[in-house]
């Protein structure tokens, strides 16, 4: 079932390791097939080096295993809440990449202060609030997804224009139209976080004019985008 999608999700997860944003068994990526309502996701605790496409797990939106010999990622419920909250999202990635996670631990959002940021994220990359003790002791992973959705509640139309978030005390989640795009955004987010940390060390108070942010984002993603060969 969904053999091509399992291959796609497998290779997307492997790219996380190849790009250096995950170690050991850290991180996970998934994609939802909106036709069946099923999600293909990395198995829990399986080392990337030994993982194969057939190890990917298929679950429904209630978290029931539809196909697979392993348990799905421990973060599955977070992915599912995001798929339910935002139908535009087709793929999700979670990592513990160094700089993005450091900022999440600090509770720091990432303001748009440079054009690299503006090329991919239209505005600040937000950091969520901390989960309450009740949220952590209850359905922790589900509540993580709900807190992310809460963070975008008043700007849900920006969900694909700001395709990532830092979960306070935890780490980054990114998304896109499919799993490949969500992985791409995870790699880019880590580089942006790196640049922001270095810039903040050099210059505490810096910003970027809104017109530069708008120009760089829209030349790549706007109605009249002209970046690339399309």
Where would I find each of the regions flagged by the language model?
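Glycine-rich flexible loops
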Residues: 1-230
């Amino acid at each position: 079932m969904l053999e091509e999608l399992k291959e796609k999700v497998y290779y997307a997860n492997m790219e996380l390791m190849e790009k250096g944003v995950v170690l050991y068994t850290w991180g996970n990526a998934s994609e939802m097939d909106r036709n069946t309502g099923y999600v293909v996701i990395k198995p829990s605790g399986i080392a990337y080096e030994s993982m194969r496409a057939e190890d990917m797990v298929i679950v429904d939106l209630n978290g029931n295993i539809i196909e697979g010999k392993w348990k799905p990622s421990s973060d599955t419920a977070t992915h599912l809440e995001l798929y339910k909250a935002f139908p535009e999202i087709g793929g999700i990635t979670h990592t513990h990449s160094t700089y993005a996670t450091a900022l999440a631990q600090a509770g720091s959002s990432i303001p748009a202060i440079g054009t690299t940021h503006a090329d991919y994220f239209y505005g600040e990359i937000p950091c969520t609030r901390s989960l309450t003790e009740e949220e952590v002791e209850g359905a922790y992973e589900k509540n993580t997804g709900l807190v992310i959705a809460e963070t975008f509640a008043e700007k849900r139309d920006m969900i694909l224009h700001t395709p990532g978030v830092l979960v306070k005390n935890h780490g980054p989640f990114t998304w896109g139209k499919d799993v490949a795009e969500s992985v791409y955004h995870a790699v880019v987010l880590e580089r942006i976080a790196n640049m922001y940390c270095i810039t903040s060390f050099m210059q505490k108070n810096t910003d970027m004019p809104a017109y530069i942010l708008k120009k760089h984002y829209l030349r790549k993603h706007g109605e009249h985008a002209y970046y690339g060969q399309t």
